[in-house]
Structures are given as structure tokens and as C-alpha cells.
UniProtKB/Swiss-Prot annotation:
NCBIfam families: PRK13055.1, PRK13337.1, YegS/Rv2252/BmrU family lipid kinase. Belongs to the diacylglycerol/lipid kinase family. This is Diacylglycerol kinase. The gene is dagK. One of its GO terms (molecular function) is ATP binding. Its EC number is 2.7.1.107.
């Protein structure tokens, strides 16, 4: 019996490129042995709804084609269910942090080849209160950049749009008094921002979590304490090289469970999208989602365990 695949795609991502090559993508997957269909999202929440429906229809494979926000919605549609389908990713967003972390090809057909090759690995995801994320959660004014940057600017200058918006927001930054409980530790004080990372790539910074593992059951927690603009600029420069972890204003730790609260209003960023406000409880769900990955993705820099398996569809 042929395996069934469902593509869930954002037609506006990547300058609408996926929509134009969709017929070729369907043919390529059909030739590889997948009975394939597609669904185009129209508004926020559509990808989650369709992922839930696809799960009920017992698809063997879901493919998320879009940015990190689309992938987040698909993960939220399947994360709570025991019979989760395997997940393929076609990175089509402005930054594609998760795709970068997995070393997925940036071209559509190359990403489909990864799916067809059939190598999968189990990766961690995070649970924040009642929703899920696959790459990062964060709080602080600067972390709002990804969802406050205008879409038009992103389409014109790509990832540089985030840097433009980030520099624009720097003067607005102020430290907030927060309480962060992480495993058996507590931080109580003023912080400019905090980040919980599951991968090594966040907001285009591929060395923000230089020792990230995708499957070890731990978040990487980064807290930037109260600092002036000069200190913050220095930290950001160091972060581009992965050298920020020893800065005196930076707390860098690993944790499985994290609770964050504040008496001050603080918005949250979840996989690059608005994620509500504090308080929040975070829990790492170890090796919870099975993702198609390149053959060479397993190495000590990315994965703690050799969890890769091979899947070959029936072409009959």
C-alpha cells in the first residue's frame, strides 16, 4: 500500500515561489512513491487545523512548506497525539532557523530530496503552557523584532530586515524584573531579555547556542541581565561569533523545566511569532517529533544520540 503525504504550505512565503512549483513538487513525490496532496493556508491557525485533520485522516507524512511560523503551527497540530506522522520540512521563510539547524537545503527540490531519501531523526520540542514550539521561546523588547518587522520590508531585504528593525528598537529597550526558575536554580532580578533555545540557530544567529543538541531533552537558557547600550552591542557582536556565553552580563545554562514570571507586562516570542505574555511554564519534550533530515545530520555537534532511521515508501 502506498504511503500518503500531505503538504501544508504558506502560499505567501518565499515570494510565493512554492505555489509556482507545487505541480513539480507533487510529481516528484508521486514518483518517489507517495500519494500526495496539498493544502494552502490563508490565515493564522490554518496550518494547525489542517495538521489535526491530516492526522485524523491517518496520513503517513506531513510536509510543512513555509517559514518557522508555519512549521510551528503544524507541530502544534500533531504534538499532543500519540500517533504522530513523520514530518518533512521545506524552508520557505525569511530566516528559516529550524531548517538552518538541520542543515536542510534552501532550494525546494533539494529539501524534497531529503524527504525522499527517507532518513529521519527524533528531535526535542518545547511546551509553553498549552502550546508547543520547535525552535525557541523568548521574552524582552528585542525579541519582538521577528513579528513586528513589516512583511514588505522582509520581502525586499530578506533577513537584513530583522537587523534594521532591531537597531530601530534598541533605544526602547529596558530591563524588566523577572523571576526565572530553571531546574534547581533561580534568577531573580532585572533582565533585558531571555531566550530558551532548542537548536543552535535563533533569529539568524547560528552560534547563539554553540553547544545545542536537538535531542538531549534540555533547553539552552540565555538570560541577558540589565546592561547599557554599549554592553548590549558588545554582547550582540560576541553572539555572532558564539563568544557571548562568558560575558558577565550573560547567564548561560541548561534546563529541562523552566518557570518565568514577572509583575511587569512582558510579551513572548514563540518560534518567531507573538506567543502571549508572562507568566509561562516551559517543559522540554525529549525526542518528541520525528523529522526527515539529511543523511549526514548525525554528528556530536547536533545530536546526543544516533536516532536516525531509514524509511522507503512503497512505489507500487
Amino acid at each position: 500500500m502506498r504511503k500518503r503525504a500531505r503538504i501544508i504550505y504558506n502560499p505567501t512565503s518565499g515570494k510565493e515561489l512554492f505555489k509556482r512549483v507545487l505541480p513539480d513538487a507533487l510529481i516528484k513525490l508521486e514518483k518517489a512513491g507517495y500519494e500526495t496532496s496539498a493544502y494552502a493556508t490563508e490565515k493564522i491557525g490554518d496550518a494547525t487545523f489542517e495538521a489535526e485533520r491530516a492526522l485524523e485522516s491517518e496520513y503517513d507524512l506531513l510536509i510543512a512548506a513555509g517559514g518557522d511560523g508555519t512549521l510551528n503551527e503544524v507541530v502544534n497540530g500533531i504534538a499532543e497525539q500519540p500517533n504522530r506522522p513523520k514530518l518533512g520540512v521545506i524552508p520557505m521563510g525569511t530566516v528559516n532557523d529550524f531548517g538552518r539547524a538541520l542543515h536542510l537545503p534552501s532550494d525546494i527540490m533539494g529539501a524534497i530530496d531529503v524527504i525522499i531519501d527517507g532518513h529521519t531523526t527524533k528531535v526535542d520540542i518545547g511546551k509553553m503552557n498549552n502550546r508547543y514550539f520547535i525552535n525557541l521561546a523568548a521574552g524582552g523588547k528585542l525579541t519582538q523584532v521577528s513579528y513586528e518587522t513589516p512583511s514588505k520590508l522582509k520581502s525586499i531585504v530578506g533577513p537584513f530586515a530583522y537587523y534594521i528593525k532591531g537597531f530601530e528598537m534598541l533605544p526602547q529597550m529596558k530591563a524588566v524584573d523577572v523571576r526565572i526558575e530553571y531546574d534547581d536554580n533561580i534568577f531573580q532580578g532585572e533582565a533585558l531579555l531571555f531566550l530558551l533555545g532548542l537548536t543552535n540557530s535563533m533569529a539568524g544567529f547560528e552560534k547563539l547556542v554553540p553547544d545545542a543538541k536537538l535531542d538531549d531533552g534540555y533547553f539552552t537558557l540565555i538570560i541577558v541581565e540589565k546592561a547599557n547600550l554599549a554592553e548590549l552591542g558588545h554582547i550582540m557582536t560576541l553572539a555572532s561569533r558564539g563568544e557571548h556565553t562568558k560575558h558577565p552580563k550573560v547567564i548561560y545554562a541548561k534546563a529541562k523545566s523552566i518557570n518565568i514570571s514577572s509583575f511587569t507586562d512582558m510579551q513572548l516570542n514563540v518560534d518567531g511569532e507573538y506567543g502571549g505574555k508572562l507568566p509561562a511554564n516551559f517543559l522540554n519534550l525529549e525526542q518528541h517529533i520525528e523529522i526527515f533530515t539529511p543523511k549526514d545530520v548525525f554528528n556530536e555537534e547536533l545530536l546526543e544520540n544516533d536516532t536516525i532511521t531509514d524509511i522507503t515508501p512503497d512505489k507500487q
